[in-house]
Amino acid sequence: MSKNKTKLIITTPQGYFFNDDVEIVTLKTTEGYIGIQKDSQSLIASIKPSKLFINQINSKDLKICAISGGIAFIDKNEIKIITDAIEFKEDIDLERAKKGKEIIEQKLKKPNLSKSKIEEYNLKIEKANNRINVKNNSDTF
């Protein structure tokens, strides 16, 4: 068992998405990508819609996820992430993601949209693009 482990807990409105020991988690904050390991400094960070990388204990394989945003609470031995949506790369339905994006793009073309609706639709497009990019692109940032 690795001594360099930290607990990662990811929760969504549906419950626990991930709850296990990891060596490192890489996620994108408003300041850019950060890697979090055991003995990290305490931090609360806003997570941008992006790829999230999970390196489990004694594994060379990365788990890659599409996260729609959220908040990370980081301390010395634990990382807690709260998000409204996250899914593993292999679970992303690419056609559904593309169709969802097309629907939102059509809504965005309607005249007389309020500023808040435009912002809401743009965020939904950003999240859809993230899911599409995570599914299509290589396993890098």
Curated annotation (Swiss-Prot):
NCBIfam families: ATP_synt_epsi (TIGR01216). Produces ATP from ADP in the presence of a proton gradient across the membrane. Its main location: membrane. It is found in: Cell membrane. GO terms for molecular function: ATP binding; proton-transporting ATP synthase activity, rotational mechanism. It is a peripheral membrane protein. GO terms for cellular component: plasma membrane; proton-transporting ATP synthase complex. F-type ATPases have 2 components, CF(1) - the catalytic core - and CF(0) - the membrane proton channel. CF(1) has five subunits: alpha(3), beta(3), gamma(1), delta(1), epsilon(1). CF(0) has three main subunits: a, b and c. This is ATP synthase epsilon chain. HAMAP family: ATP_synth_epsil_bac (MF_00530). Signal peptide: none annotated. InterPro entries: ATP_synth_F1_dsu/esu, ATP_synth_F1_dsu/esu_N, ATPsynth_dsu/esu_N. It comes from Mycoplasma mobile (strain ATCC 43663 / 163K / NCTC 11711) (Mesomycoplasma mobile). Keywords: ATP synthesis, Cell membrane, CF(1), Hydrogen ion transport, Ion transport, Membrane, Transport. It comes from the Bacteria. Belongs to the ATPase epsilon chain family.
